[in-house]
Amino acid sequence: MGALEPSWCLLFLPVLLTVGGLSPVQAQSDTFPRCDCSSVSPGVLAGIVLGDLVLTLLIALAVYSLGRLVSRGQGTAEGTRKQHIAETESPYQELQGQRPEVYSDLNTQRQYYR
């Protein structure tokens, strides 16, 4: 543990200010002028948090219900379409027996590569 990390230095800052004759509150008030802003009461803060949770749950519920509706609609149409394709077409080509004329020219060209 050779050198102190920056987070440890921040922990020692109030101690250094107190030893130097300044309390952390005095140092802050001298550096930054007092703000005349309105403070947020705990009730308002709790209302914001609860409202956020309710809206998040409503959005999740809406996405879930829409996802179920879309997958149901596509699932039935897709299933009948797949059955229709399976009845009309085969994805595999039938074997057509041996055709020696396809490979007959390979034997004639082989002598050039020797």
Swiss-Prot record:
GO cellular component: cell surface; plasma membrane
A single BP term in Gene Ontology: negative regulation of transforming growth factor beta1 production
Keyword set, alphabetical order: Calcium, Cell membrane, Disulfide bond, Immunity, Membrane, Metal-binding, Phosphoprotein, Signal, Transmembrane, Transmembrane helix
Limits of the ITAM domain: 81-109
Segments in the Extracellular topological domain: 22-42
Topological domains, Cytoplasmic: 64-114
InterPro entries in UniProt: Tyrobp
Localization annotation: Cell membrane
Induction: Induced in microglia following nerve injury (at protein level). Induced in liver dendritic cells by physiological concentrations of lipopolysaccharide.
Important for interaction with transmembrane receptors (site feature) positions: 56
Family, as annotated: Belongs to the TYROBP family.
Protein name: TYRO protein tyrosine kinase-binding protein
